[in-house]
Amino acid sequence: SSIVHCLRELNFNVRISDDVEVLEEADVVILPGVGAFPSAMKELFDRNLVGYLQDRARRQKPIIGICLGMQLLTEGSYEHRYTAGLGLIPGEVIPLEDPKWHIGWNTLDCLKDDLIVQASISKAFYFNHSLVYSGPSKYKICVSHYKKTFPSVIGKGKIIGLQFHPEKSQAPG
């Protein structure tokens, strides 16, 4: 509901749905994420959304994944046990090393010339995660630093993943 509130405050027309016909009308589908990768993928399968999201990505219709939603965009995750993901962005999700949780504010270092992301340089964003993306460099748009460097924004075409929570990051989000 934080994402919905944030988007409505910015005057976006927001609909929450798992109906493919409703999602197809959307300019952008946002995959939020709180919870565990295996149960989230099970929910997507149970709601018959996996095939739809894969097809939407093939057609280059925008999808934004936030936190766990970003992780679901990948080929799979080692959270609890290996679970296959949507496979929209090559790479996997692995546990953070010590410390095992990253909760707090960090800046983004951009690796690509993305104008929207470039506007976010030197601003802090809110993170709350215990897993990170591990994959080819060409899909890493921004990195952040917490003991070690990790990807904080990934993307392939019109599929974008944000490890941070823009809706909890105040004005920069």
Segments the model singles out, each with a brief description of its role:
Residues 1-62, 68, 92-94, 172:
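N-terminal beta1-alpha1 cap of cysteine-dependent amidohydrolase-like domains
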Residues 23, 118-119, 154:
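Short, flexible hinge/linker loops that cap or flank conserved catalytic cores
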Residues 33-34, 68, 130, 164-166:
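Glycine-rich His-Gly loop
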Residues 132-173:
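C-terminal and late-domain segments of enzyme folds
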Residues 67, 71-73:
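Glycine-rich nucleophile elbow surrounding the catalytic serine of serine-hydrolase chemistry
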Residues 75-148:
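Pocket-forming structural segment of enzyme catalytic cores
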